[in-house]
């Protein structure tokens, strides 16, 4: 472990590759089995069984679905912009995965004398000789949140279909409306932690001092606005089947369609991980489980809540969606910032 490459110890590169592989496999498996879990959970909530045929209680259903989509015919509409049509699913999928780069999923561990944070993104401090957390984690996530929608808009435009275009335009309008409220909702967290570092925000929530208790309104607003940003029910207007056939992905098939599907669920996992980090104490929990296990448990609980919401609430009408974002959520976030600022000023 004493070898160096480009002035950095080999342990830095080894740990980086290991963390990338672990996180990628975790997100991929979670996405695959979230589709299965959603069908089973909604099925039981509606007094049905859900998938039962493929494997024991349908446990192999995600594999069967993946194989089916992989071997289906790739169809590109004759009037479509082929290059944009093919690249749109990639633009939608990649930001959903790389958002995990800055999320800390456990406590710092020590290997061969080096302290390694359980977080992919970081830089090697040559003075201390340790991997240090970047102080821009939240800004990185907010920036990525607005990139995925470009893939959806591009898919709608390049398909040369009115239904796809309407779905893409709805997605962009929805993202603008709710990203503003979501960003303002977490300003109160910055005011309490006095940092943009996710490591620092998690550290401030130790011993049960979770920000969801100190900032319940911000927690609820951020979670709901995030669901609207990623087009989850009841905010799935961009792909409303009763109005737009299948919205922005109407003309897609095979693995291109699967990539949009994966992007939706990967975004859901990322939103739940960010919410866990900002409001639910991150990896903090009772000592009988390691920190990373608590982090995963909280993320899976929020994923279950997302599925519960889908099974419970009907889809909003488009004008109701816009009114809720601009006339209800945005003023509430501003009021919450003002009240938090007053409280912080009085305490200091």
From Swiss-Prot:
Gene Ontology biological process: aerobic respiration
Subcellular location: Cell inner membrane
E.C. no: 7.1.1.-
Topology of this chain in the membrane: Multi-pass membrane protein
Enzyme class per UniProt: translocase
Catalyses which reaction(s): a quinone + NADH + 5 H(+)(in) = a quinol + NAD(+) + 4 H(+)(out)
Signal peptide extent: none
Pfam families xrefs: NADHdh (PF00146)
Keywords for this protein: Cell inner membrane, Cell membrane, Membrane, NAD, Quinone, Translocase, Transmembrane, Transmembrane helix, Ubiquinone
Superkingdom: Bacteria
Transmembrane segment boundaries: 11-31, 83-103, 136-156, 172-192, 208-228, 268-288, 289-309, 324-344
Location (main, coarse): membrane
PROSITE patterns assigned to the protein according to its UniProt record, in alphabetical order: COMPLEX1_ND1_1, COMPLEX1_ND1_2
Coiled coil among keywords: no
Subunit structure, as described in the record: NDH-1 is composed of 14 different subunits. Subunits NuoA, H, J, K, L, M, N constitute the membrane sector of the complex.
Family annotation (HAMAP family): NDH1_NuoH
Family classification: Belongs to the complex I subunit 1 family.
Function: NDH-1 shuttles electrons from NADH, via FMN and iron-sulfur (Fe-S) centers, to quinones in the respiratory chain. The immediate electron acceptor for the enzyme in this species is believed to be ubiquinone. Couples the redox reaction to proton translocation (for every two electrons transferred, four hydrogen ions are translocated across the cytoplasmic membrane), and thus conserves the redox energy in a proton gradient. This subunit may bind ubiquinone.
Protein's name according to its UniProt entry: NADH-quinone oxidoreductase subunit H 1
Biological classification of the source: Bacteria, Pseudomonadati, Thermodesulfobacteriota, Desulfuromonadia, Geobacterales
């Amino acid at each position: 472990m004493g070898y160096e490459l480009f002035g950095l110890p080999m342990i830095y590169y080894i740990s980086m590759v290991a963390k990338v592989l672990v996180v990628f496999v975790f997100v991929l498996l979670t996405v695959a089995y979230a589709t299965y879990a959603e069908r089973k959970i909604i099925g039981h909530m509606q007094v049905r069984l859900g998938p039962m045929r493929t494997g024991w209680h349908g446990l192999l259903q995600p594999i069967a679905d993946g194989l089916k989509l992989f071997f289906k015919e790739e169809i590109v509409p004759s009037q479509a912009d082929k290059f944009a049509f093919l690249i749109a699913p990639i633009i939608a999928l990649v930001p959903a995965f790389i958002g995990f780069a800055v999320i800390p999923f456990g406590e710092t561990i020590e290997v061969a004398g080096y302290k390694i944070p359980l977080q992919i993104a970081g830089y090697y401090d040559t003075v201390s000789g340790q991997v240090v957390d970047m102080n821009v984690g939240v800004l990185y996530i907010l920036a990525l949140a607005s990139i995925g929608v470009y893939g959806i808009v591009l898919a709608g435009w390049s398909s040369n279909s009115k239904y796809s275009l309407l779905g893409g335009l709805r997605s962009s309008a929805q993202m603008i409306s709710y990203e503003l409220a979501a960003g303002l909702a977490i300003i109160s967290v910055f005011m309490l932690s006095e940092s943009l570092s996710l490591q620092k925000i998690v550290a401030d929530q130790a011993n049960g001092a979770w920000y969801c208790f100190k900032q319940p309104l911000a927690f609820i607003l951020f979670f709901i606005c995030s669901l609207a940003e990623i087009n989850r029910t009841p905010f799935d207007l961009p792909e409303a089947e009763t109005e737009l056939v299948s919205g922005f992905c109407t003309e897609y098939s095979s693995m291109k369609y699967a990539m949009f599907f994966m992007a939706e669920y990967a975004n859901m996992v990322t939103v739940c991980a960010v919410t866990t980090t900002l409001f639910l104490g991150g990896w903090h929990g009772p000592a009988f489980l390691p920190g990373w296990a608590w982090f995963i448990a909280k993320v899976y609980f929020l994923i279950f809540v997302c599925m519960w919401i889908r099974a419970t609430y009907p889809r909003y009408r488009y004008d109701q969606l816009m009114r809720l974002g601009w006339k209800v959520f945005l003023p509430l976030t501003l009021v919450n910032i003002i009240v938090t600022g007053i409280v912080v000023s009085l305490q200091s």
